[in-house]
Regions:
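Flavin-dependent oxidoreductase catalytic cores
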Residues: 1-407, 411, 415-422, 426-427, ...
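A conserved FAD-binding loop/helix module that cradles the flavin
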Residues: 556-563, 583-586, 590, 660-683
């Protein structure tokens, strides 16, 4: 939490919020700044972050989402943003970038451009459209475009810029030999020629704005898993060149390329936990920390670069305050760059400074924010319903203190209790199980711990409602008579959904384990062992045969399949709907998990009809043809159904009765938290 400098800019501490698009713009804004975005950044500044980097729209001449800085007309809006950030004593930077070969991928834009035009069969990212190679006059125009954008940012009152030369964006296509096949002055012949465009941009920014206008250069420290990708030795050389050009700090993260064995389906990400999911790769890239499922994975890269430069080095990627502190104290880096943890809790820096680590709302690494952003949709957070709604969701004291009963100790119930207690209500929470968490411990067991950390959410919510004085009643089922005795003003039912058991011949057979029965058994074991230990024990023994058919190919079925594959089962997924994977995040998570399942030999069948279950297995029909899938065990993993029985029985008991979460409409954790946060602000 000590202050430091980037160039002449003094930071409050060593935590930087990097420049990631939040997409709070609307069509009516036409690229101009709006109050929603300003409110979010002001809240982040108020939360104590050392330096805030605001996002801008890509520097292309097109109707793209985001807040633009390509013309002078956008300066006044950015001036308001800079003032809001400065209001709470935080320096303000803005990121500038050009999407390059990614241009037409997620929004309407001109065809992509890059250092070279590479056929799809040879491309590092074959599902990108083939990009057009930039001629030298256009390269010089782009250098000027970056320089003018930085000039506008300075006029708006910002203290510096973050130059994004990483990921798969335009500038990285020059730095990387995998993308750059040119033979001219900007070609692949030397580090200097590959870095030439970035060097010229930094020099132009300094020429236009003076040497005191700070520049952070963001680069890929390595392109892990990519043939001819950037190596640490190369990024060390790039860092030296960019420092010589005038960069005031070097920001480092890894780009992870996830290749299948046949090398035909390549994807990449700068989210390291995806590289470790559903299981770590057999061969790990050099200089990557693999000890924490992706947390701190890029620290060794940044540490290597720090040895080669005299300017501060920033590490980006999945990080925690504890690992960040260790990396800074050991001299491996000077700053940590966070995004998702700060979206999950804007007050993270203030809480770290106060020693209140247990009060930090944890990022569970669900990647919901990234998935929304990749679709150019407003970014929201699984655990922080106030993200993007900072002004509307500011906690306000209740006009009248009420006695509030919350039924259910899952995420919806605990979030409701937390917010209601913050507003001054007297809150009583009832959970029929002996522990809080609802279905989250079971979800943690099945999901595993390679990517998501849902257990941290349980710990956080439990800690908060305990500190706020919520009266927690475990092992008590709510009945009409209990409510009549308590006489609350408000009842909020968050009791979870019910398991759907299909009406099918043979469903009661000995080989069948319905989701209801599976949950009941696992919950019993969870009481004694906990999710982490039980996760290990199930790798030794499970009450399931070798061949398993999963009825239901949505998110629960796919995650269950991965869970069973890791435990040596041969799995078949059958789904009545149009596709496998409904409910999984469309970007990264779904394609990566489905490819992994396919590579592991999982058979996935959609558009089927369940016919019957016999001792041999499950009989289905598909396209008019019947077949029996032989199985030793059949597991149902169908979507939950609403559970309205308690709601119906209590409607006439108290003035206000609400149903939220899965008992109203089964969805995901983000929906449960959002439901609880919303309803608790209205009572």
């Amino acid at each position: 939490m000590e202050p430091a400098y980037i160039g002449k800019v003094s930071t409050r501490n060593r935590i930087i919020k990097n420049g990631t698009g939040l997409f709070y713009d609307t069509k009516a804004d036409r690229g101009h700044m709006n109050d929603t975005n300003i409110a979010c950044y002001e809240a982040l500044s108020k939360g104590g972050v050392g330096l805030l980097v605001a996002a801008t729209a890509p520097l292309i001449d097109a109707d793209v989402p985001g807040f633009r800085i390509t013309r002078d007309e956008y300066i006044p809006g950015f001036s308001k943003l800079a003032a809001a950030i400065h209001k709470h004593g935080c320096p303000a930077f803005a990121q500038i970038f050009h999407v390059g070969p990614m241009s037409p991928l997620f929004f309407k834009a001109p065809s992509g451009v890059a250092a070279s035009s590479i056929p799809k069969s040879e491309s590092p990212r074959p599902f990108f459209e083939v990009a057009r190679a930039l001629p030298i006059p256009e390269i010089q125009d782009i250098v000027e475009t970056f320089g003018k954008a930085a000039e506008r940012i300075k006029k708006a009152g910002f203290d510096g810029i973050e130059l994004n030369s990483a990921t798969n964006h335009l500038l990285n296509s020059f730095l990387s030999r995998a993308w750059n096949r040119r033979q001219d002055a900007y070609g692949c012949g030397s580090l200097e020629s590959r870095a030439k465009i970035v060097i010229e941009i930094i020099q132009d920014i300094k020429r236009r704005n003076g040497r005191d206008f700070a520049v952070i250069a963001l680069i890929n420290g390595a392109e892990v898993g990519l043939k001819q990708g950037i190596t640490l030795e190369e990024s060390k050389g790039f860092a030296r060149l960019l420092e010589e050009a005038g960069a005031d700090a070097i920001e480092v993260r890894a780009e992870f390329y996830m290749n299948t064995e046949d090398d035909k389906r390549r994807d990449s990400t700068h989210f390291p936990e995806i590289y470790f999911y559903p299981e770590p790769p057999k061969v790990m890239g050099a200089n990557i920390d693999r000890n924490h499922h992706g947390v701190g994975a890029s620290v060794p890269l940044a540490a290597g670069i720090k040895k080669m430069v005299s300017v501060p080095v920033i590490v980006a990627g999945r990080l925690t305050p504890e690992l960040g502190e260790k990396a800074i104290r050991s001299g491996m880096v000077d700053f940590i760059s966070l995004n998702r943890p700060l979206l999950a809790d804007h007050e993270l820096p203030n809480k770290v400074a106060a020693g209140r680590l247990e009060d930090i709302r944890p990022c569970t690494s669900c990647l919901t924010c990234f998935d929304l952003g990749e679709h150019a949709q407003p970014v929201h957070c699984q655990v922080n319903a106030a993200l993007g709604r900072e002004r509307e969701y500011a906690i306000k004291a209740a006009k009248r203190k009420k006695r509030v009963v919350v039924v259910g100790g899952g995420p919806a119930g605990m979030e409701t209790a937390r917010v209601a207690a913050l507003r001054g209500h007297e809150v009583m929470l009832y959970e029929k199980e002996p522990k809080l968490g609802g279905s989250l411990p079971l979800a943690a067991l099945v999901k595993g711990f390679e990517r998501e950390d849902v257990l941290s959410l349980i710990r956080y919510l439990k800690t908060q409602i305990t500190k706020l004085g919520v009266k927690i009643n475990l092992g008590r089922e709510v009945t009409r008579s209990l409510i009549e005795e308590i006489k609350p003003d408000v009842i909020i039912i968050a009791a979870g959904g019910t398991h759907d058991v299909p009406k099918l011949s043979g469903i009661d057979g000995r080989t069948v384990l319905t989701s209801r029965d599976l949950h009941r058994k696992l919950k019993t074991y969870l009481k004694f062992f906990g999710p982490r230990l039980l996760n290990r024990l199930t790798k030794i023994w499970m009450p399931l045969g070798k061949r398993v058919v999963i009825m239901g190919g949505g998110i629960h079925g796919c995650q269950t399949a991965a869970f069973l594959v890791k435990r040596g089962r041969k799995v078949t997924i059958v789904e009545t709907g149009k596709e496998i994977g409904d409910g999984l995040l469309e970007v990264l998570v779904k394609p990566h998990l489905l490819m992994w399942l396919a590579d592991k030999g999982v058979t996935m069948m959609a558009k089927v009809k369940y016919e019957k279950i016999t001792d041999k297995g499950l009989t289905i029909s598909q396209k008019g043809k019947k077949q029996t899938i032989e199985a030793d065990s059949i597991v149902t993993a169908l979507p939950l159904k609403p559970n309205t029985e308690l709601l119906k029985s209590l409607k006439d008991v108290v003035p206000e009765v609400y149903a939220i979460g899965d008992c109203k409409e089964p969805h995901l954790i983000i929906d449960a938290i959002a439901d609880g946060a919303r309803i608790a602000r209205t009572i």
